[in-house]
Amino acid sequence: MLKTISGTLALSLIIAASVHQAQAATTYNAVVSKSSSDGKTFKTIADAIASAPAGSTPFVILIKNGVYNERLTITRNNLLLKGESRNGAVIAAATAAGTLKSDGSKWGTAGSSTITISAKDFSAQSLTIRNDFDFPANQAKSDSDSSKIKDTQAVALYVTKSGDRAYFKDVSLVGYQDTLYVSGGRSFFSDCRISGTVDFIFGDGTALFNNCDLVSRYRADVKSGNVSGYLTAPSTNINQKYGLVITNSRVIRESDSVPAKSYGLGRPWHPTTTFSDGRYADPNAIGQTVFLNTSMDNHIYGWDKMSGKDKNGNTIWFNPEDSRFFEYKSYGAGAAVSKDRRQLTDAQAAEYTQSKVLGDWTPTLP
């Protein structure tokens, strides 16, 4: 017995030493810490990013635990932000679409983002990105209160059309309305947690989510029996094969306070767009959301419709059956098979592998 215990202890020490050596072997080009600053340690993430040399060689920044109240726009290719821990290293800001700039104009949805990615080969690992706009407090205000913000979209992460091959590993995205905006290129989210209320994953980009938690939040401002929100609002162009693809993941509630059948899996967003003959809902935005092998709690009721404006400014409705909304082997209390929840065949589901969705890109960390 003593020999067995000794052998086990020795093996544990070897494993621990190997892990320590692997961590120690990681090379960081810059370190961000709330507590110290020297030639290679910065107090803000923005300063650390600014220290990266021109070019596209990999540049890795370690972010020590702490809350960093910053708004960042990433334009440098091949940058990795690596947190000390997912819950400990937090990047946060509190801007809504209706928040006013110094010149009196509104930030708008895209402008509200805590982090904006306009670069190729960006990566983030083991950190949290939050938009701390206080949606519940704002909704609790009277409509006659002049301080109440009407445009409550508040983006935590925005991948722009200039971004491509954006990789997020073990990252938490926290917000309410419009938490994650994927507008361009390809993004991959692995082992992530994304929480919100209304359309909290949206856009026309290609984004693959694997082994992620999609968390629907409680809304005190919604009356019992009414819809609280929607997980996705894709605006995928009809000529684009892939939109929002969720595989091997979990659709869960923030708490038991989130009512049954209060959240839709998605609704079709046809963004108002300027054309040669006017400004109206984009008819070519035939959004795609697909859930494969994903568990669903009982707060899910299915898909929903979404409104837009026609050429004359009249309200029109876009229905889920006219979009590319599908499921494959959903399970759990919120799963169902019906004419309103279309299912993929085995052959169709085989078209949604990582290599097919992401094409010639295999996500790796620097």
UniProtKB/Swiss-Prot annotation:
Entry's Gene Ontology cellular component terms: cell outer membrane; extracellular region
Protein name as it appears in the record: Pectinesterase A
Quaternary state and interactors: Monomer.
Reaction(s) the record says it catalyses: [(1->4)-alpha-D-galacturonosyl methyl ester](n) + n H2O = [(1->4)-alpha-D-galacturonosyl](n) + n methanol + n H(+)
UniProt-annotated site: Transition state stabilizer, residues: Q177
Similarity section: Belongs to the pectinesterase family.
Active site per UniProt: D178, D199
Residue numbers binding substrate: T109, Q153, R219, N226, Y230, R267, W269, T272
Signal peptide: 1-24
Organism: Dickeya chrysanthemi
